[in-house]
Swiss-Prot record:
It comes from the Eukaryota. InterPro entries: AH/BAR_dom_sf (IPR027267), F_BAR (IPR031160), FCH_dom (IPR001060), Rho-GAP (IPR050729), Rho_GTPase_activation_prot (IPR008936), RhoGAP_dom (IPR000198). The lineage of its organism: Eukaryota, Fungi, Dikarya, Ascomycota, Taphrinomycotina. It comes from Schizosaccharomyces pombe (strain 972 / ATCC 24843) (Fission yeast). This is Probable Rho-GTPase-activating protein 7. Residues 1-26, 320-499 are annotated as: Disordered. One of its GO terms (molecular function) is GTPase activator activity. The modification Phosphoserine is found at S496, S497. The keyword Coiled coil applies. GO terms for cellular component: actin cortical patch; cell cortex; cell cortex of cell tip; cell division site; cell tip; cleavage furrow; cytoplasmic side of plasma membrane; cytosol. GO terms for biological process: actin cytoskeleton organization; Golgi to plasma membrane protein transport; mitotic division septum assembly; negative regulation of cell integrity MAPK cascade; positive regulation of mitotic division septum assembly; small GTPase-mediated signal transduction. Residues 506-692 form the Rho-GAP domain.
Length: 695
């Protein structure tokens, strides 16, 4: 006789975490008439078990949320920490001068490091939350199985008692029938006649048969009464003890899971609030301190005027050794009196000329003019080589670095100004280094006879100016360029690299992240069009389309990855083009739909001989895929299963689909590996709704 299991001996009540705090008032909901009638029926066990499974699924999803949130916080914290540390080192190494702006930026980078540390702390706490919820889920799952096993044991005991009762009733009815037949034979024994070779039974034989039938019927009746009594007792215990017991255990487990979920989510909300508050106080504390001043207070300490003064003083000290020996602010330039002879220009005063030292290094040549030009250096201590006319070189092409000769020259003093001015005024070509060739020509009457000289290579000229020069006008630049024997080399523009597609050849997870969906839009559009207009199309995915239509449809998706296909007119009524585009998309993924590090699992699963074991191996390999790949291959497999259901019309069996899609989903595989993977595709299609849940 079965009895109700006690809480100390039955495995149906394992230790709970958190402890069960279900009070008697909580069980009042079980006393409602409709609820009590349903739970005490045969449906009660299945309903309560499904309820607990739903809660456990929610618990598992919550643990997954905590885990993924911790991963995001870890990535965010590490990236922010790396970024802040990098720029903190940059500002500390490059900005040596004590400036308030640099100090404020450094303080802000330190604050960002604190924010990164907060994110890492939050990540550790969330990871601990996830581990705790997963551990609780495992314990609750064990308790659910234990309660279910106990409940099924009691239900099966009752069903077994009822079945034994029915069998005993059948045996009693059979024995009763035999007894009645034996009694009838005894009563009609005197009138029996010989039939064939068999003699009629005697009265003694008929009496013996009657006694045996009566004894058998009495035993069957006794067994039937005992089985009926046993079934009644088992039913009474089930309805009064066992069934209410496991209903309460299921209900208590449900309350326990509810309490755990609410408590953990409440801890999560408090953690988010505290982390947000901590970040806010770090960014803007209520009472700024030297160690925690906040971003706003750090920016308030910026003083642009003080920074400018400190920078100028610091720069003056830094450039003390590299200052110009001729300071325009400390040099007094006197305009000497000059006489330009008779003519209309007599009595006029030339504008002041910026003191300029020109050093022209001539290239020795036997054809060079032996008559030296008047030296522009009045100082006799400096040897004046034969310099050609300075107008033959363009000052704009002077190199940036001076020649060694220029470093030994000194600018003209006030005593030498007359000589240099008169020499420069007597030669109009040296009066201004910025004048153009056309403006420097003297009047026709004053020009000397032309002297034919051979063409010399360009002469390098080094010019040291003691004051700021004004850029030459565009006309002068153009004229000098025209006179120059050199021409700029025309450089053909480099062809621009083709624009990288954001869809074809990209990573699957990047596409899904960019589109904010679980499945790429192009996959959704292509599969929906094939299911709506191509299920009955013979040779779908096997018969190719024209490349022009496929390329046109491809360009449309490249220009707009979120393109929507509504009617067959959007792709010229060619469903084969849509099917080809879908295969091209999966074939050109940067990483195949089955990643390289998972391909071996699928290939090994296809090599398993037993079909049920091969299905289990494929199921395990599918569950190990990343989320993006799992959702996409799930959608594709359900789509191919729909294609296979119409194989009588479209002639695309499971084997045909596997042969076509095997090389498309994986890459860099040998022929035997592709053959094994094709068997894996067949398992996916045939057992689609066993491996995947159909939503």
């Amino acid at each position: 006789m079965l009895s109700a299991p006690s809480s100390s001996t039955t495995p149906a009540s394992p230790p709970t975490s958190p402890p069960n705090t279900t009070s008697s008032d909580d069980f009042a909901v079980l006393k409602e008439p409709k609820v009590e009638a349903i739970l005490n029926s045969e449906l009660g066990l299945a309903i309560l078990n499904d309820r607990i499974k739903d809660y456990l699924l929610t618990c598992k999803e919550l643990a997954g949320f905590f885990k993924k949130r911790s991963i995001l916080e870890e990535e965010s914290g590490k990236n922010l920490q790396k970024l802040a540390k990098s720029y903190l080192e940059t500002f500390q190494s490059k900005h040596h001068s004590p400036q308030s702006f640099s100090a404020s930026v450094i303080t802000s980078m330190e604050i960002h490091e604190q924010l990164a540390n907060h994110s890492l702390t939050l990540q550790k706490t969330l990871s601990a939350f996830s581990d705790q919820v997963i551990e609780f889920h495992k314990n609750a799952e064990r308790k659910r199985k234990s309660i279910k096993e106990y409940a099924k044991k009691q239900e099966n005991a009752y069903l077994e008692a009822v079945m034994q009762m029915d069998k005993s009733k059948s045996r009693f009815k059979g024995a009763e029938t035999e007894y009645n037949r034996a009694l009838d034979n005894k009563n009609t024994g005197d009138s029996q006649k010989k039939v064939g070779f068999f003699k009629p039974k005697s009265n003694a034989q008929l009496t013996k048969l009657e006694d045996e039938a009566r004894l058998k019927a009495e035993n069957a009746e006794s067994d039937m009464h005992s089985k009926i009594e046993n079934a009644q007792n088992v039913q009474k215990q089930l309805l009064c003890i066992h069934r209410p017991n496991y209903i309460k255990q299921f209900f208590s487990l449900q309350r326990e899971i509810e309490s755990s979920l609410i408590a953990n989510y409440l801890r999560y909300t408090k953690l988010c609030e505290s982390n947000t508050l901590l970040n806010g106080l770090t960014i803007r504390p209520q009472k700024p301190t030297p160690t925690n001043c906040g971003l706003q207070h750090a920016l308030d300490n910026i003083n642009a005027n003080t920074d400018f003064v400190q920078y100028v003083l610091h720069a003056s000290i830094k450039h003390e050794d590299n200052k110009n020996p001729t300071d325009a602010s400390k040099t007094k330039i006197i305009q000497p009196p000059s006489s330009y002879g008779t003519g209309s220009s007599a009595g006029k005063t030339n504008p002041p000329v910026n003191p300029t030292i020109k050093v022209t290094a001539a290239i020795p040549s036997p054809l060079q003019n032996t008559n030296p030009a008047p030296s522009t250096f009045p100082n006799p201590s400096v040897a004046s080589p034969a310099f050609p006319n300075s107008s033959t070189s363009n000052p704009s092409t002077a190199p940036a670095s001076a020649s060694p000769l220029a470093s030994t020259l000194k600018p003209s003093t006030a005593n030498d100004t007359n000589g240099s001015s008169s020499s420069s005024s007597s030669n109009p070509r040296t009066s201004s280094p910025l004048a153009s060739n056309a403006e420097n020509k003297p009047p026709v009457a004053q020009q000397s006879p032309p002297v034919l000289l051979p063409t010399l290579p360009p002469i390098q000229t080094t010019t040291i100016q003691t004051s700021r020069e004004v850029a030459p006008p565009p006309s002068s630049i153009n004229s000098n360029r025209a006179a120059s024997p050199f021409r700029p080399t025309s450089v053909s523009p480099q062809p621009s690299s083709p624009t990288k597609s954001l869809l074809f050849g990209a990573r699957l997870d990047a596409i899904i992240l960019r589109e904010h969906s679980n499945i790429p839009n192009i996959v959704m559009q292509c599969t929906s069009q094939v299911e709506n207009f191509g299920l009955n199309l013979q040779g779908i995915y096997r018969v190719p389309s024209s490349s022009a239509r496929v390329n046109m449809l491809r360009s449309q998706f490249e220009n707009n990855p979120l393109l929507q296909l509504h009617t067959p007119e959007d792709y010229e009524n060619d469903v084969h083009a849509v099917a080809d585009l879908l295969k091209i998309f999966f074939r050109e993924l940067r990483e195949p739909l089955i990643p390289d590090n998972h391909q071996r699992d699928f290939i090994d699963a296809g090599n398993v001989e037993d079909e049920s074991r091969r299905r289990d191996a494929v199921h395990r390999a599918i569950n190990d895929l990343p989320d993006a790949n799992y959702s996409t291959i799930r959608h594709l497999t359900i789509h191919l299963a729909k294609i296979k259901e119409n194989s009588d019309v479209n002639k695309m069996s499971t084997n045909n689909l596997a042969i076509i899609w095997g090389p498309t989903i994986i890459k860099q595989a040998t022929i035997p590996e592709i053959s094994s993977f094709s068997r894996t595709i067949e398992i996916l299609i045939d057992y689609c709704f066993t491996i995947f849940d159909y939503d």
